[in-house]
């Protein structure tokens, strides 16, 4: 695994990282809730992954932990945002500056804010 020195990790104990994963420069892992990053996954520069939110119906605005899972071989491209409770499927791609607020299917490429499906990711063999 490779984690750049400029990466910000809120709570290291709530972070699981698979073999050969890369966490790029200026990535923010706001992991009050658990964040799991799969093997060979890439989190590119400036991405922000957030595993908590607030209960907007609670008068005290209580914190709610919502774990984030990023599958093996997934890529979260530059300056993207992955929101609380989101699962990024195996091999999925979230394009640059994309914002994921719901589950992204495996081996599918997404882009935009909110992220929308662009096409199936096909690997060269």
Locate predicted features:
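Flexible, glycine/small-residue-enriched loop-and-beta-strand segment within the central core
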Residues: 5-17, 22-87, 108, 113-114, ...
């Amino acid at each position: 695994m490779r984690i750049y020195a400029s990466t910000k990790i809120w709570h290291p104990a709530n972070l699981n990282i698979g073999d050969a994963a890369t966490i790029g420069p200026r990535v923010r892992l706001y992991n009050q809730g658990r964040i799991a990053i799969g093997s060979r996954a890439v989190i590119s520069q400036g991405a922000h992954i957030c595993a908590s939110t607030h209960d907007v119906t609670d008068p005290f605005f209580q914190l709610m932990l919502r774990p984030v899972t990023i599958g093996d071989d997934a890529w979260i491209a530059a300056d993207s945002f992955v929101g609380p409770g989101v699962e990024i499927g195996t091999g999925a791609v979230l394009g640059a500056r994309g914002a994921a607020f719901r589950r992204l299917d495996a081996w599918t490429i997404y882009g935009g804010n909110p992220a929308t499906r662009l096409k199936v990711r096909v690997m060269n063999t």
